[in-house]
UniProtKB/Swiss-Prot annotation:
Photorespiratory enzyme that dephosphorylates the 2-phosphoglycolate produced by the RuBisCO oxygenation reaction. It comes from Arabidopsis thaliana. The modification N-acetylthreonine is found at residue 55. This is Phosphoglycolate phosphatase 1A, chloroplastic. It is found in: Plastid, Chloroplast. One of its GO terms (cellular component) is chloroplast.
């Protein structure tokens, strides 16, 4: 069970409060604005968090001074734990990125704790463990944290009533994690086959025992799911709207970028006029969970990722060191763009640059 500080909810920051051309970000806040008193049951401590706003005053000098990683050993020796994103860092689609096995082996040999965090909710932790194994990587299930798991862990952290149900817009990973956590659910891939036949006076029914709608990446997304989720959120008192992530794009294959989970979440935002509670990166829920579980000091963590608005912001929100790799969605031109307000501590071409005391030139 998580500490109450970890159990605080994630609340969205209004897009009107952001700098021009920056993307919405999320921070921890009490759930009191989203849940009925009957749901809360006193399990959530009210915390007077102010929404995090990206302004010139809180972009720190440290964040403004990105350096190319030149001394890999110095960074490695300065932290105890490395948190790695997966897509674009460890693999692209189903292809392993060059040098990854040797890099992970080297870090383990140096006594470093390795954790793998992904916003991809299509698989459970166990299923991700099999993917690591298929790619020839020796990774323990306890080292893997997917946003599918984060959704179930979040519901556990707020003592979500076991007599309430969760409607899932997403794939098998979310269903498996909810089942392992002991929650009732409906929806998922099966609802991808459902269609709505509109007739005069037609009224779509929905389950009034649904207390949360969880939205993640969904290749079976359709109008039925949008309407069902909308009805639950708008008509069931205290119903939570939870998003595993708001990633704009994802890597289903290594050939191109594909529309990400944010496109599914956006549809529900539009229909409900509600902002979701985001449990994946860049919200600090998973970072707080990991720090709580492993007893990690956040100052002793380096977050390694390929996305500025999720991975790097995730690390910065958690007070960690950050390393951007250019093996995924972010290019050097995007990093150096005047419009980019999210600057990592370091950047390099790929994680195998750790193998050289003097990192490769980008």
């Amino acid at each position: 069970m998580l500490s109450r500080s970890v159990a605080s909810a994630v609340t969205p920051v209004s897009s009107s409060s952001l700098l021009p051309n920056s993307k919405p970000i999320f921070c921890l806040k009490t759930l009191s604005g989203y849940r009925s008193s009957s749901f809360c049951g006193g399990c959530i401590r009210k915390i007077n968090h102010k929404p995090l706003r990206m302004t010139s005053s809180n972009i720190t000098p440290r964040a403004m001074a990105t350096q190319q990683l030149e001394n890999a050993d110095q960074l490695i020796d300065s932290v105890e734990t490395f948190i790695f994103d997966c897509d674009g860092v460890i693999w692209k689609g189903d292809k392993l990125i060059e040098g990854v096995p040797e890099t992970l082996d080297m870090l383990r040999a140096k006594g470093k704790r390795l954790v793998f965090v992904t916003n991809n909710s299509t698989k459970s932790r166990k299923q991700y463990g099999k993917k690591f194994e298929t790619l020839g990587l020796n990774v323990n299930e306890e080292e893997i944290f997917a946003s599918s798991f984060a959704a179930a862990a979040y519901l556990q952290s707020i003592n979500f009533p076991k007599d309430k149900k969760v409607y899932v817009i997403g794939e098998e990973g979310i269903l498996k994690e909810l089942e392992l956590a002991g929650f009732q659910y409906l929806g998922g891939p099966d609802d991808g086959k459902r269609q709505i036949e509109l007739k005069p006076g037609f009224l779509m029914e929905h389950d009034h025992d649904v207390g949360a709608v969880v939205v993640g990446f969904d290749r079976y997304f359709n109008y039925y799911k949008i309407q069902y989720g909308t009805l639950c959120i708008r008509e069931n008192p205290g119903c939570l709207f939870i998003a595993t992530n708001r990633d704009a794009v994802t890597h289903l294959t290594d050939a191109q970028e594909w529309a990400g989970g944010g496109s599914m979440v956006g549809a529900l935002v539009g229909s409900t006029q509600r902002e979701p509670l985001v449990v994946g990166k860049p919200s600090t829920f998973m970072m707080d969970y990991l720090a709580d579980k492993f007893g990690i000091q956040k100052s002793q963590i380096c977050m390694v990722g390929d996305r500025l608005d999720t991975d790097i912001l995730f690390g910065q929100n958690g007070g960690c060191k950050t390393l951007l790799v250019l093996s995924g969605v972010t290019s050097i031109s995007m990093l150096e763009s005047p419009e980019n307000k999210i600057q990592p501590d370091f950047y390099t071409s790929k994680i195998s640059d750790f193998l050289s005391p003097k990192a490769a030139t980008v």
